[in-house]
Amino acid sequence: MDVNPTLLFLKVPAQNAISTTFPYTGDPPYSHGTGTGYTMDTVNRTHQYSEQGKWTTNTETGAPQLNPIDGPLPEDNEPSGYAQTDCVLEAMAFLEKSHPGIFENSCLETMEIVQQTRVDKLTQGRQTYDWTLNRNQPAATALANTIEVFRSNGLTANESGRLIDFLKDVMESMNKGEMEITTHFQRKRRVRDNMTKKMVTQRTIGKKKQRLNKRSYLIRALTLNTMTKDAERGKLKRRAIATPGMQIRGFVYFVETLARSICEKLEQSGLPVGGNEKKAKLANVVRKMMTNSQDTELSFTITGDNTKWNENQNPRMFLAMITYITRKQPEWFRNVLSIAPIMFSNKMARLGKGYMFESKSMKLRTQIPAEMLASIDLKYFNESTRKKIEKIRPLLIDGTASLSPGMMMGMFNMLSTVLGVSILNLGQKRYTKTTYWWDGLQSSDDFALIVNAPNHEGIQAGVDRFYRTCKLVGINMSKKKSYINRTGTFEFTSFFYRYGFVANFSMELPSFGVSGINESADMSIGVTVIKNNMINNDLGPATAQMALQLFIKDYRYTYRCHRGDTQIQTRRSFELKKLWEQTRSKAGLLVSDGGPNLYNIRNLHIPEVCLKWELMDEDYQGRLCNPLNPFVSHKEIESVNNAVVMPAHGPAKSMEYDAVATTHSWVPKRNRSILNTSQRGILEDEQMYQKCCNLFEKFFPSSSYRRPVGISSMVEAMVSRARIDARIDFESGRIKKEEFAEIMKICSTIE
């Protein structure tokens, strides 16, 4: 059933159709090649906005640093990062005055979390800069490597597994004269292949020890690696994002925990909530402003955009904020929280892979690593790159650029939101002391500002005052990209408000379709996405029914599983026809086995296997749900799995779907080619790590899984657990005396 899309819009009001103008269908753009240029752009831009600050030199690393704090007050509308400390502190004080006790309560909550968080919190998150290998790794591997190096250098605070103890190690490591690390390297040899008698290149992986002096270690500890942000829609240019290393991560986590706790208590904050909860919160603020603007008042809303939010934020400002927020707290707590902003004031940006050169005539390609940019002759580069390199050269040390001002993308989202809200908070009449007043919403760098005043002049004055107040704390509202409307129509974090939030359905478009995990998961995810959009995004019954039919069609084409009685010929059709003919109850066949589709919009919540179970032939049931079926490598499947779906905006979301284990829930095997590369050692580490975790989970199944308290190691915890379980099983008669004795014997040998 193919549909002419224009039919969908015949009776649609204009505001509901606005979402179709978004660049959301089709594949998003991905970046290829090196991110070095984008990173240099970021570094140069950041320095440009703060160029009138003071230059100093870091005594430990020798890095030149620019400090724009308390710099000149702006005289024009250009973006600038000259935040004034006293203004930031005053904004914090007013925020506390409006919300008595907010900072103290959040500090108490955070203090409790700080004392309880385990170091494995850092295994969450994707790519992390691994300072031991000087490149990105999965978070768990990077953490394991860091702890291993710490241990071999005599730092053992992290044995008990608390994050705070690991951070003590980090602090101590920075005072050490030198650190010894193990790095991987590749050897290439030309050897003759016995079978083919041809020459082949053989690679072997070596590990070697390397000593880093204090300066080199500090540079690595303060380094943020950079990557290009992928899949960004609606932009012509790509941009760089940062992946910090393990030394910085833990400290940032605690600062963000405190800031999150504050944001939860602020009605103007769009973080940390999301979805329908966020919409309700925002609608409240709008309602408040509209009810308060009596017949005599005008109310206008600015859909705001800030110029270069990250480049103009400053870690030194965050330090001032934290110092103020924690001023009544114990010394140790204040110290732990102030380290993240201090590290960020001394951060180094790693320039990535460097540049690739190719000579067409000689068919040669060569990579110029970032480390060489400081000394290479610039005649090889084009004009724009040459300018970039010239600008950045004074800042380069060992292939990293000193970047003191500015925050890289996504590092302190919560804390910067607190700063933004503190300016919105100043709009109350009791603070403005004039006829105009404002309120609004803030979510990281996105904001909406609602201004009320008796006349247009008042609105203009209110906006001007807001604009100038923001400038004082390093926030630059863009006059070109912000626009103003009568209150009732605005956009905030891609939610469109028109007397209530309009469902922006096109945001969800990319998550429709076949995910490509396996036949079982794809069917389940597909129908769950449709179900969720009927609940949350005004997907109407007729459109949902159409989406479902398109999905089934897409699914059949993807897995070549057209109905058994179809005329379409594919590689699978011969087998599927045979199955169709020998099946008595054809309605019981899964769609992926050439069966009919029994889904409609009423039964989307039921997994397909359950939907058809009663209709299946017995021998088909036996084949489909047989754990001993030799053709299937099984994962142990929980009743609920998580899929990663890509909405068009923001990060990939995790979505739950029902998982029923059948012979269709296969897991593809890993690509073998990784085994011949330098990643092999890492892969083995990762598998080792995985095995240990799985073993641990076996002893502490999630229902009873309370992490072992105290200082026992994983092994001790598992042994004591095994003893308890064995005793219970023995006393209840589930195991024999001999078995019990054997278990006890094994336990004591392990100890």
Swiss-Prot record:
Signal peptide: none annotated. Pfam families: Flu_PB1 (PF00602). The gene is PB1. Keywords: Eukaryotic host gene expression shutoff by virus, Eukaryotic host transcription shutoff by virus, Host cytoplasm, Host gene expression shutoff by virus, Host nucleus, Host-virus interaction, Inhibition of host RNA polymerase II by virus, Nucleotide-binding, Nucleotidyltransferase, Phosphoprotein, RNA-directed RNA polymerase, Transferase, Viral RNA replication, Viral transcription. Its EC number is 2.7.7.48. HAMAP family: INFV_RDRP. This is RNA-directed RNA polymerase catalytic subunit. A motif (Nuclear localization signal) lies at residues 187-195, 203-216. Belongs to the influenza viruses polymerase PB1 family. It comes from Influenza A virus (strain A/Duck/Hong Kong/2986.1/2000 H5N1 genotype C).
